[in-house]
Amino acid sequence: MRVIRSLALAASLFAAGPALAAGSAPTPPDARFGFAGFFGTFDRGALQRGFQVYKEVCAACHAMRQLSYRNLLEIGLSEAQVREIAAQFQVTDGPNDEGQMFERPARLSDRFRRPFPNEQAARAANNGAYPPDLSVMVKARPDGANYLYALLTGYVDPPPGVEVMEGMHYNAWFPGHQIAMPNILNPDGVEYADGTPATVEQQARDVTTFLAWAAEPELEQRRRMGVQVLIFLAILGGLVYATKRKVWADVKH
């Protein structure tokens, strides 16, 4: 139920409100992600870089409450690395023996820490805008990965004659072209441990890959199972056909 509620919330926030996003945005171009297509898979290096972008840039405003720290084991990080990452965050636990809530370092089993305790605090810190949870954001609309990549790289100067409202920012791909979120990606805004140049396009591609995985972490397993089922059905079909030919071989038509 929480996943369904998150999808509904993400979809409502992804769509533009009447006052802020009248009109429609053009269809985003195909970013040619490696996980797209029937045989697509997630690149572990891109996932780890994408998590770094989320952690260092996006997590200041956006939660991912559908993920626990232990899920980071699935993107190729070691248990020691994940424990170190989790321990950087304080979470509320309790009550203790005295009936008091207390703060402690996060564990593998804890969900990602939220940047704000509630919606009101989030809006107060963001000029009234509510940063949506990103757990299933890529699934919130059709072609979500391509749209999100285009959105993150779509901050440009407004065309002549276009007036941008106070507190809004012009984006070529957002419906209505005016969005409350500022351009958060800057060249070399993060320093990748593997030496990959941290261009805006690379950061956008990596964090989109991470968010696509977060929205559907079972994607690779499901596709492998689909291939296995197709192979099984092909073999079964061949056996059934061969059996039919043998059983009916002596029957005259």
List PLM regions with ranges.
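N-terminal signal peptide c-region/cleavage motif recognized by signal peptidases
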Residues: 16-18
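Electrostatic cytochrome c docking/interface patches
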Residues: 27-52, 63-82, 195, 215, ...
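Membrane-proximal low-complexity regions enriched in glycine and acidic/polar residues
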Residues: 90-178
